[in-house]
Amino acid sequence: MIKIPLNTLSAKSAAALDQELMSSGAFSIDQLMELAGLSVSQAVFKLQPLNKGKRILVACGPGNNGGDGLVAARHLFHYGYQPTIYYPKQSKNELYQRLRKQLEDLKVPFTEDFPGALKQTDHVVDAIFGFSFSGEVREPFPKVIEALESTSIPVLAVDAPSSWSIEDGPPESGPGKGFMPPALISLTAPKPLVKHFKGRHFLGGRFLSPEMAEQYNLDIPKYEGLDQVVEVPVESGKL
């Protein structure tokens, strides 16, 4: 685990960075989602080696966070895991349709029964809401987040534990008030919520140019070997 402090990236700055990556950075949304999902899959591999259980339940929301989950599930399948997808509010966007088709071609199952699937898994990926989340948790996700909050199954949250405010952390009431998953992977850079997080913290962002990192005052940690993720201490987030 690295010990250097890392700066955090607000929701507004994260959105601006994404737009810049897709303009002056010349990345496509497909590339960014592929890199994010690959990072998520590697974090799962570090947290849940195959000999600890192969069944992975990936809970996907309707936006980019859910897309990251779909990509991660595809990589996990090729690593030898047995992913199951919970994707109740599917986007009609062509990118997400292709990501679903790729999983269907691999015979990866989709389920509408989250409580049932949760009883038959070894690990959960929370890819429901990401850095753009705000407001109330809408159906069908309140009960899903409550189930994640109470389960003893290990959970990896993608960019943010679902229902959390990117700036302020867990909500004061309602679904997710007590949601503290064992692990979190921050994508590109940690968000301010990390100051409230108490579990293991990974960073996936091994694609930023030094110039863009400097522009957004971000630190690029040292990644080992072929790794797309690095574990960082949660107390490293600076505001």
Swiss-Prot record:
Co-factor requirement: K(+)
Residues annotated to bind (6S)-NADPHX: 64-68, 130-136, 159
Catalysed reaction, written as an equation: (6R)-NADHX = (6S)-NADHX; (6R)-NADPHX = (6S)-NADPHX
Location of this chain's protein in the cell: Cytoplasm; Mitochondrion
UniProt keyword list: Cytoplasm, Isomerase, Metal-binding, Mitochondrion, NAD, NADP, Nucleotide-binding, Potassium
Residue ranges of coiled coil: none
Class of the enzyme per the UniProt entry, highest EC level: isomerase
Superkingdom, natural source: Eukaryota
UniProt cross-references to PANTHER family, sorted A to Z: NAD(P)H-HYDRATE EPIMERASE
Descriptive protein name: NAD(P)H-hydrate epimerase
Species name: Phaeosphaeria nodorum (strain SN15 / ATCC MYA-4574 / FGSC 10173)
